[in-house]
């Protein structure tokens, strides 16, 4: 088991939820945190509830760094409209998130690595920055040389997840389009996400 995989499962155990809905996650058997005292759970304070909401959202998108996550919050505040909805939109526009939604990778962690290794094209050009912001109408596809990779084929054929309505994808061509910006209600999170609590956490 790699360190990346270990950290992924520790995130699930620490937060007490199966963030990505994976059937083999250890949290399905042990609903408490890692370590000797993992079974001790106290009723969280308001701060604790807000912190948990932030950690869940950060963790879901591949455990984004706190610095980068806070930048998303700042950008969400600057934009017009509901800050919590803006935050979700910014996260869902990440290239690795779009690759994950198109089912070209089995987890957000795998999607980030897939992008950084240069396997993905956006509008015909290779982009290896996982945080790249995909725009409405952008075409995202797997490079020709990468279409037969086992990890891609396994993910596409997996029945674990469905492609959301704001994504259009042709799995035979390994190509898809980011059709529109999603709202929170559109995003198929396996667990409840509360971006409003994230906003409360940062605006304290």
Curated annotation (Swiss-Prot):
Q: Where is this region: Disordered?
A: 21-45
Any idea where the S4 RNA-binding domain is?
A: 93-156
User: Which ranges of the sequence are coiled-coil?
Assistant: none
Superkingdom as given in the UniProt entry = Bacteria
In terms of CDD domains, this protein maps to: S4
The UniProt GO MF terms for this protein read: rRNA binding; structural constituent of ribosome
Q: Name one GO cellular component term.
A: small ribosomal subunit
Q: Which GO terms describe its biological process?
A: ribosomal small subunit biogenesis; translation
Which keywords has UniProt assigned to this entry? Ribonucleoprotein, Ribosomal protein, RNA-binding, rRNA-binding
Subunit notes for this chain?
Part of the 30S ribosomal subunit. Contacts protein S5. The interaction surface between S4 and S5 is involved in control of translational fidelity.
Q: What does this protein do?
A: One of the primary rRNA binding proteins, it binds directly to 16S rRNA where it nucleates assembly of the body of the 30S subunit.
User: Which family, according to UniProt?
Assistant: Belongs to the universal ribosomal protein uS4 family.
Query: What's the protein called, per UniProt?
Result: Small ribosomal subunit protein uS4
